Amino acid sequence: MSGLNAEQLDEIEERVTELLEKPWRKGKGRQKELSLREALIVTCGYKRNNITEEIWAEIFDVDQSTISRYITFLTPLVDQGTAEFRPGAQEAADAIRGAVALVDGTLWPCWSWAGERELWAGKYKTTGHGSLIITNLRGDIVYVSEPVPGNQHDMRKLQGSECAKILKLAGGVIGDKGFIGTDYITTPVRKPQGRELYMREHDYNNQVSSLRAPVERAVADLKTWRILFTDYRRPLRTFLTSFRAAIGLYFFKLSFA
């Protein structure tokens, strides 16, 4: 349910325990409804499956408010406990320097909160936050950018960003049509006005698409942490911490491979 095996849960529990200001289990008085391990299964499982708090409450036979409280409390600690596994910009630059890089933009969907018009992503026809994903030619993710409002298109996310600095160190970069206009990213040919693409242009686009396939698979794999794939339902102010926790858990799990 948590997306982690027993060994991985052991380590997460150890890391979170070190971050707690007070012991989870008190020596006296009323005890918490769930053990720390159970609460971490809920918190990590919420990131993995994005099923409702009500269902988690039924699974553990507690109130929904208890589940919500534990997720709220433990998510920042999971974020902190897995932070070292999230690749930083310098680490990504070192990994991709002189090599071929792939880049893709993606959306992390969320509810349509009233008054948050900047979350509307016209390309996806829904609301959410967007990031850029950088991989090597094999599709290994080397960098996930911080999320920005969904109304920012890929070129806007790229301009002046850490991603741009990383990609400019690569030996070559391949992206989709969203990156047309840069002088360092190879993209498909856009259909010109007034005519169809020539056969050689179709062939070229197919080659670019084939080379880009690993980054698309990598994004799909990242989104097996379903909180990144289906609508984020918790309060908007909690999204960034939840996002970082989910990304951290993804790379934490990979470290056991």
Regions found by a protein language model. Give the residues of each.
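Ser/Thr-centered flexible coil motifs
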Residues: 5, 35, 198-200
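Short, amphipathic alpha-helical "recognition" segments used to contact nucleic acids or chromatin
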Residues: 35-50
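Glycine-/proline-rich flexible loop or hinge segments
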Residues: 23-28, 50-57
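Short secondary-structure boundary/capping segments within folded domains
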Residues: 3-4, 31-34, 45, 123
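A short, structure-level motif marking secondary-structure boundaries and short turns
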Residues: 27-28, 37-39, 203-204
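Charged, often Cys/His-bearing segments associated with DNA-binding zinc-finger transcription factors
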Residues: 1-31
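Short, well-ordered secondary-structure "scaffold" segments embedded in the functional core
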Residues: 52-257
